[in-house]
Swiss-Prot record:
Taxonomy of the source species: Bacteria, Pseudomonadati, Pseudomonadota, Gammaproteobacteria, Alteromonadales
Catalytic reaction equation(s): (R)-pantoate + beta-alanine + ATP = (R)-pantothenate + AMP + diphosphate + H(+)
Catalytic activity, EC: 6.3.2.1
Native organism: Shewanella baltica (strain OS185)
Keywords from the named record: ATP-binding, Cytoplasm, Ligase, Nucleotide-binding, Pantothenate biosynthesis
UniProt protein name: Pantothenate synthetase
């Protein structure tokens, strides 16, 4: 696998592949990789002739008092895992490469509406940072296909909306959430959990599953939401949000809606965990 922190190196290699008529898939990450990321890379390898990955802990998407400085950097292990999974080119830019004028003078991309609810309400500016860095990476790599995890459901919709609105010729593919045996969604932030917290953490998925089951049986949104929040609190979580939304727009779900998604974010110890369930009724 070729690794470079320089934009020109990435463009040169991709141009060489393009000159031979070959296709390119892209998997952007922040590093500290787990099996969920590796699944994205393997899926990417099945879609295109070549796979490009990136590792960049993006300061623009972290708010004040968030874990930018503490976010684990594990480049050597990540590189080994990416190579084994089929990545051929790894882009590892520094903040200076991506934001040479600094964050305050950086042009940014903002996807209105869908960016301002749920995680966007709890983390102001987060999705502006996500959309900006992903747009920049797309312009550098210019892939045919880009893959993202369904665990970050709102992020996936933000990116799909950006690609559609800006007429970018890229297919965005969401890949199913990879879970531990307990049902806990794999996340780089699971490393913040103590043993006791990790044992309690599967309650997040259990609460979401119970909500969906009740809704399918005709229970009210309000009743199932309150029950699920109570279960989370009993398990040691502090809920940030737990909501039922329209699966395509993230607008508040209405009783007549069929395509639904339950989205949750909750704190346990030092970790903020998110999860979701997309379903039809």
């Amino acid at each position: 696998m070729i690794t470079s922190a320089h934009i020109d190196d990435i463009r040169t290699q991709v141009r060489a592949w393009r000159a031979k008529g070959e296709t390119v898939a892209f998997v952007p990450t922040m590093g500290n990789l787990h099996q969920g990321h590796i699944t994205l890379v393997k899926e990417a390898a099945s879609k295109c002739d070549h796979v490009v990955a990136s590792i960049f802990v993006n300061p623009m998407q972290f708010g004040q008092n968030e874990d930018l400085d503490a976010y684990p950097r594990t480049l050597a292990a990540d590189s080994e895992a990416l190579t084994a999974a089929g990545a051929e080119l790894l882009f590892t830019p520094t903040p200076t490469v991506m934001y040479p004028k600094g964050l305050e003078q950086q042009t940014y991309v903002e996807v209105p509406g869908i960016s301002n609810v749920l995680c966007g309400a709890s983390r102001p500016g987060h999705f502006r940072g996500v959309a900006t860095i992903v747009c920049k990476l797309f312009n550098i790599v210019q892939p045919d296909v880009a893959l993202f995890g369904n665990k970050d459901y709102q992020q996936l919709l933000v990116i799909k909306t950006m690609v559609e609105d800006l007429s970018l010729p890229i297919e965005i593919i969401g890949v199913d959430t990879i879970r531990e045996d307990s049902g806990l969604a794999m996340s780089s932030r699971n490393g913040y959990l103590t043993a006791a917290e990790k044992a309690a953490a599967p309650a997040l998925k259990q609460a979401i599953d119970a909500m969906a089951a009740g809704i399918k049986q005709g229970e009210s949104f309000e009743q199932m939401t309150e029950q699920a929040k109570a279960c989370l609190v009993a398990a040691g979580f502090t809920p940030d949000y737990l909501e039922i939304r329209h699966a395509h727009t993230l607008e508040q779900a209405q009783n007549q809606d069929h395509a639904l998604v339950i989205l949750a974010a909750a704190y346990i110890g030092k970790a903020r965990l998110i999860d979701n369930l997309r379903f039809d009724r």
